Amino acid sequence: MRRLFTSESVTEGHPDKICDQISDAILDEILKKDPYARVACETAVTTGLVLVMGEITTECYVDIPRIARDVIRDIGYTRAKYGFDADTCAVITSIDEQSPDIAMGVNKALEARRGELTDAEIEAIGAGDQGLMIGFACDETEELMPMPIMLAHKLARRLAEVRKNGTLSYLRPDGKTQVTVEYEEDRPVRVDSVVVSAQHAPEVDHDTIEKDIIEHVVNVIIPENMMDKNTKIFVNPTGRFVLGGPQADSGLTGRKIIVDTYGGYARHGGGAFSGKDPTKVDRSASYAARYVAKNIVAAGLAKKCEVQVAYAIGVATPLEVEINTFGTGKISDEKISEIVKKVFDLRPAAIIRDLDLRRPIYRQVAAYGHFGRHDLDLPWEKTDRVDILRKLAGI
């Protein structure tokens, strides 16, 4: 049976992604100075304005307006004619401390000792919120990710690359990509369509942009054996994309949660990642669930695996750890679930310890996906539990 599946990505200059990167850059700067800080940092952008708000409890000071301007500058909004630029935009901050009602559920242990935690202390550090988190992996790509989202991310990164290195100097920071992949018997067989929307200078005509993007972006990223004469390529299909970025659309942290994860191929628990310190299970448990799923697929226990974990606020042990291999498992899902509980400790403090999450590693994943990033050394992408999983599975 043949079917189509589509995923999209956005460039680092997309308004929502600007916000994600500012929120995570602030988080990183705080974690450099105070690894035990509590951070829930939200950003909004619109024409000429950045608003940073949230709850931050820390012993250190960081210059939030400077961080925001540095991110905007790095992305490429450096000229007033773009309608938004690092030097002239206003930055407003509204920061409170974390609610003591939330903190009491997370602070119970002797966490402030800064040392090794005993099992009792790990058990006493509850989840920072209720909720369900999803992790996923499949063997469609070398990154063990679904092909549509990986190709969409690579196209978006390539758009930024050719803009920044001068290959296509008329491009501007905002942009979106979309890839539709055709599957046969649940395996990707061809790319059915590609959509690239790239912000550009007003003086460049559409034919030039279309030709350049097909040559320097699409043909560089999409494997030749995945395209054929029927593959459809759309470049700026409206014909013009001059007005973009926060001047054209306001942006908010946490509005690209499907782009950040699996492109809609797997389910999503609903919680965003950026701007949240690792005591927030929205972030840390989603990373841990990906770590579990990736190791299961890498170990050959299944071709495809979705892991769902759920928590209650203030309670350390997950309420559930559910495994679904969609009929691709070498052993039953129930057996894999039992093995996972032996191999992985999914209590929040144990996740933070095992993945070493109290580090400034978050801005780098705030654009182009949090998973499948072979260009980065991310702890949740390691496949270091493969041998023990195989041993316990008897394969």
UniProtKB/Swiss-Prot annotation:
Residues forming coiled coils: none
Cited Gene3D superfamilies: 3.30.300.10
Positions that bind L-methionine: 55, 98, 249, 280
Residues that bind ATP: 14, 174-176, 240-241, 249, 255-256, 272, 276
Region (Flexible loop): 98-108
Swiss-Prot/TrEMBL keywords: ATP-binding, Cytoplasm, Magnesium, Metal-binding, Nucleotide-binding, One-carbon metabolism, Potassium, Transferase
UniProt binding sites for K(+): 42
MF-aspect GO terms: ATP binding; magnesium ion binding; methionine adenosyltransferase activity
GO (cellular component) term, any one: cytoplasm
Cofactor note: Binds 2 divalent ions per subunit. Binds 1 potassium ion per subunit.
SUPFAM superfamilies referenced in this protein's UniProt entry, alphabetically: S-adenosylmethionine synthetase
Matches recorded under PROSITE patterns: ADOMET_SYNTHASE_1 (PS00376), ADOMET_SYNTHASE_2 (PS00377)
Subunit composition and interactions: Homotetramer; dimer of dimers.
Protein family per UniProt: Belongs to the AdoMet synthase family.
Protein name: S-adenosylmethionine synthase
Originating organism: Caldanaerobacter subterraneus subsp. tengcongensis (strain DSM 15242 / JCM 11007 / NBRC 100824 / MB4)
Gene that encodes the chain: metK
